[in-house]
């Protein structure tokens, strides 16, 4: 997605925020909403990684960890970052059985990647590498800042819309307040999804280039989708506005390209990756390498 389109989408979310502010407090409310939206963008610029990681219950994995699987995981991420020409990101783990992962940070120099314990336990080493290469692609494409700012505004719009029901009666009437309360979060969600869904395809392609085998990511996506259907991610459930940051929707496992899906269809993503593998002369399921005999087996 181009920079111009990203700014357009973020401007649309700010406009929604301002419209609700007008309903709640007239012109003064609209101006205040604009100031708050601008402040949230500035806050997200400097604190996006800390905010998201804290809300998702992520714990940093230090290089000297005694856990052999986590140590190998960190080494693999560092190797992938080197392949991509990126600084090694900080690495975090989220204690939840649902397999998933995300990246955050305002730029490659301040990036962080996080994986769930479910991801490391359910996927083999090549598949984990494919997932982390995808997340590093988001870092390289500088998607992480945009996605975090979008999540912040989307969550704030939902909360502000709820206030409209109680404070906007005199200005727009009860019916208008209810309409804003319903449709403003929906509009914010559509903007959020438009950002997420288009970027996932780009990150899939670049991630496959970083790890060297599109089939690793294709296989991982299929396993992650199955895991998302059967396992709950309590951190994502508590902050659904951040669902689009994960590699696969942590709130549901539906595989259709529906209007209110935060991610493209897994089947479509896998098909594109398999097509890419064919163009690279890679066929079948990649056999485990010698390094895969470690923690992942």
UniProtKB/Swiss-Prot annotation:
GO terms for biological process: proteolysis. The active site is at 135. Binds 1 zinc ion per subunit. InterPro entries: HtpX_protease, Pept_M48_protease_HtpX, Peptidase_M48. GO terms for molecular function: metalloendopeptidase activity; zinc ion binding. The keyword Transmembrane applies. Keywords: Cell inner membrane, Cell membrane, Hydrolase, Membrane, Metal-binding, Metalloprotease, Protease, Transmembrane, Transmembrane helix, Zinc. The keyword Repeat does not apply. The chain crosses the membrane at residues 16-36, 147-167, 175-195. It is found in: Cell inner membrane. Its cofactor is Zn(2+). PROSITE patterns: ZINC_PROTEASE. Zn(2+) binds at residues 134, 138, 200. It is a multi-pass membrane protein. Its EC number is 3.4.24.-. Belongs to the peptidase M48B family. This is Protease HtpX homolog. It comes from Hyphomonas neptunium (strain ATCC 15444). The gene is htpX.
